[in-house]
Amino acid sequence: MINNVSSLFPTVNRNITAVYKKSSFSVSPQKITLNPVKISSPFSPSSSSISATTLFRAPNAHSASFHRQSTAESSLHQQLPNVRQRLIQHLAEHGIKPARSMAEHIPPAPNWPAPPPPVQNEQSRPLPDVAQRLVQHLAEHGIQPARNMAEHIPPAPNWPAPPLPVQNEQSRPLPDVAQRLVQHLAEHGIQPARSMAEHIPPAPNWPAPPPPVQNEQSRPLPDVAQRLMQHLAEHGIQPARNMAEHIPPAPNWPAPTPPVQNEQSRPLPDVAQRLMQHLAEHGIQPARNMAEHIPPAPNWPAPTPPVQNEQSRPLPDVAQRLMQHLAEHGINTSKRS
């Protein structure tokens, strides 16, 4: 039995290495230490101790191959900048050969007949300045256009000149802004084709509005309007019309009828009397008596006394104690609740 146990330990390293080769993970250098084990057997009177220390290193074959492959690919990218060449070379390394050449799929150029030359137009205008400079710039770089650009430019339309506008005798002169604009353009050598005054219609000859009728019953201006007019006059601003013309007269309404004094009206309550006294201390006198607006007290008949019921039950305990408490303070109830 001891021999079987002793032969087990040399196979530990081989078993771990075999498991690692079948797996895809990497293992860093490890140290395995087996503690001493005392074994006793009835067949052997003495005990024996076994200890083992094994060092092993498992290289990461997958990472090493990946590092070599990435290094080769990076050098390949640097050597072949063309994407197409790198793709063909990559396929060739894996034993893949394209069935056809890529040039076979490019159709030939169509054999179209040359277009007929355009007819030169005698009325065609010359090339503009921008086109001439473009043609000159292309010629400096050795580029010759296949056709003349002037062939594609239609001739200028032969429209009749517009009729001259009729000068309006009533037309007003140009405003100050337009005159300054014309002067500014003339300083830069720009002359307008027409006068701007031709397009400005004359001022309408509207009749002056009739003056407003002065109202004899109109009241004078209020204090705010008078101060506003005085403020404008201090700054040299005179209104075109009098503001009093637009203020309607005060309505002539009849005075309200005085209220009828009610003989049965009750006097003012305490709160109203104190309010009137407070206003009088500050010199404020109400225009009317507040008692005029207080209606008289209603003259309702006195309620009928309740009928005493002989069969009425006695007062409850709470009511009896309340009546006793009032009697102790000198309060005597005239009727029984």
UniProtKB/Swiss-Prot annotation:
Keywords: Host cytoplasm, Repeat, Secreted, Virulence. Residues 291-312 are annotated as: Disordered. The keyword Repeat applies. GO terms for cellular component: extracellular region; host cell cytoplasm. Residues 295-306 have a biased composition (Pro residues). Its main location: secreted. It comes from the Bacteria. Residues 96-330 are annotated as: 5 X 48 AA approximate tandem repeats. InterPro entries: T3SS_EspF (IPR006891), TccP2/EspF(U)-like_sf (IPR044889). Interacts with host BAIAP2 and host WASL/N-WASP. Can also interact with host proteins BAIAP2L1 and WAS/WASP. Identified in a complex with host proteins BAIAP2L1 and WASL. Required for efficient pedestal formation in host epithelial cells during infection. Acts as an intermediate between Tir (via host BAIAP2) and host WASL/N-WASP. Directly binds and activates WASL/N-WASP, which stimulates actin polymerization and leads to the formation of actin pedestals at the sites of bacterial adhesion. The N-terminal 21 amino acids are necessary and sufficient for translocation into the host cell. The C-terminal region, composed of several highly conserved proline-rich repeats, interacts with the SH3 domain of BAIAP2 and BAIAP2L1, and the GTPase binding domain (GBD) of WASL/N-WASP and WAS/WASP. The N-terminal translocation signal and two proline-rich repeats are sufficient for triggering actin polymerization, but each additional repeat gives higher activity. This is Secreted effector protein EspF(U). It comes from Escherichia coli O157:H7. The lineage of its organism: Bacteria, Pseudomonadati, Pseudomonadota, Gammaproteobacteria, Enterobacterales. The gene is espF(U).
